[in-house]
């Protein structure tokens, strides 16, 4: 079975994103496009994490699926050719802006987490460094190596 993945997503809690982004619409769009694995995006944002916890169920190790009652409604009216399984992997993009050796540095890192518990631990650690609730894509003064 071929795997087609989009692993760099954001939630509606990130700047310059659709206010309509939710897990049922992501699930439906993935089916329409033949995508089998989607990143959740913005796992460190507290409001989005609540939606992750209420919208997704564990599937295979490190992957999640849309809850059946949400999936049924999201799939309504799709052509039969759009069938298949969609999985989600817990993911966040961290924007790092910092100085090193007297020079300004900017980079973005995609972080993938294997479980809700790992995501909570990661979020708790980052919360000591910056404000995670202000944007789904946290901007931290942190060297990527740290």
At which residue positions do the language-model features occur?
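Histidine-centered catalytic micro-motifs
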Residues: 4-13, 43
């Amino acid at each position: 079975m071929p795997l087609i993945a989009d692993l760099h997503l954001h939630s509606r809690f990130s700047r310059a994103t659709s206010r309509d982004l939710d897990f049922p619409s992501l699930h439906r769009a993935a089916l329409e496009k033949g995508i089998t694995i989607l990143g959740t995006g913005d796992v460190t944002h507290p409001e989005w994490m609540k939606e992750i916890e209420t919208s997704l169920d564990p599937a295979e190790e490190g992957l999640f699926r849309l809850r059946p009652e949400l999936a049924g409604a999201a799939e309504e009216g799709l052509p039969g050719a759009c069938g298949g399984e969609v999985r989600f992997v817990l993911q966040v993009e961290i924007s790092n802006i910092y100085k090193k050796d007297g020079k300004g540095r900017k980079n973005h890192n995609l972080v993938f987490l294997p479980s809700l518990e790992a995501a909570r631990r990661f979020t708790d650690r980052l919360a000591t460094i910056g404000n995670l609730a202000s944007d789904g894509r946290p901007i931290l003064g942190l060297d990527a190596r740290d």
